[in-house]
Structure formats: C-alpha cells, structure tokens
Amino acid sequence: PFAIYLKKHAHRLHLTGYRLDNAIKKAKTDEVATPDTAKDLVWGFINEETKIQPAAKGAPQALEKLQEYAQIIILSNVPYSVHNDRVANLKDLNMDYPLISNEGMKGPAVKEILKNHKAQSFFIDDNPYQVESVYKDNQQTVCVHFSVCDLVKPYMPKAVGASIEPTSWEDLVSKFIGCLKDDK
C-alpha cells in the first residue's frame, strides 16, 4: 500500500536495505526525496491511509483461529493521532481486538501489559528490532518474527530472540498451537 501511495504522489519506493533512508525517490528523475519530502509522504500515508489499509492475506482467519487459544491484543506503533482510524480499520477487517498505541520500542510496553499476567504469552511482530526488544525485557514471552511483505523480506535482518519464524499465517497458527501443546 505504501508503494501505491507513493506512486499517486509522483514518487516510488526503492529499497536497498531494511530502513526507508534514501528509499523514497522522485518517480520522474530517480532523485532521492529530500528528508522533508520523505517525512511528509510518510505522514501523509499514515494520516490518509490508516483507515483503509487492507488486511494481510490470511490474517483475519488466523487471528480468529488463535482467539480460540489466547487473548489477542494488538500493540502497534500507529501514531496516537490515527489510533481511532486504525481501530475502525481493524474492525472493518474482522480483526476487532483491543489496540494499544505505542511509541518506540515495544519491550517495555509488553512488560507493563504482562505485569500481572501468569499464562504463556506470545509476541508477534514483523520488525526484528521490536522482537529483540520484547525478548530482552520479557524472557518468558515466546517471540515470533513474521512478515508477509515480500518487498521487505530480502532486507529483513534476523530477529534476536525469535524462537518461531513462520512462513505464512497458516504456519504461524500451527506453530503457535504446537507450542501451547508442548507447554502442557
């Protein structure tokens, strides 16, 4: 969706690494967008498109299945300014789960969420640095590194602390359930 948004705004995405630094280019000249332009495009995308993001293929069905085994909470670094847009978007996509907006690394937030929690916990994220943050702050949490974005996968660093690295939503569900059965 971000690449489509950039195209509508006469830019394109040219990833050469995991980060967006220098990855947004002017479509006509191939020049790297200025930092201000890149920032404006990212924020424009967030403000205009959060409420209409599509679901990753298989995500609603997988979460529905996982809901039979666990309480699902979505911890997202979606900005507070579009929190309600994201809640509405997720509800429209049949993923009506509690959403907590976070800023920065997710390890401390997960630690706070789990403060009085005794059952097995899982953390699933596509960002390897968030997985590492949660792993370092919450050693008992099973950390899952998972992305369905083929555009980013070639540049994705290995996630420190990830004990599960599924290849699809179906694989994630299978490994999650297997992990719970092994725990009994």
Regions found by a protein language model. Name each.
Residues 32-36, 43-73, 80-87, 108-111:
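Short, acidic loop-to-helix structural element flanking the phosphoryl-transfer center
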Residues 1-41:
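Active-site neighborhood of HAD-like aspartate-dependent phosphohydrolases
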Residues 98-104, 161-175:
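Short acidic-hydrophobic, aromatic-tinged amphipathic segments that line or gate anion-handling sites
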Residues 107-112, 152-160, 175-177:
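Short, charged, surface-exposed secondary-structure boundary motifs
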Residues 79-122, 128-137:
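Substrate-recognition "cap/lid" segment bordering the active-site pocket of phosphatases
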Residues 123-165:
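Acidic, Mg2+-coordinating phosphoryl-transfer loop and its flanking beta/alpha structural elements
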Residues 110-116, 170-183:
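Short amphipathic alpha-helix with an adjacent loop that forms part of the alpha/beta core around
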Residues 71-72, 120, 142:
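Residues at the starts of beta-strands that form the adenosine-phosphate
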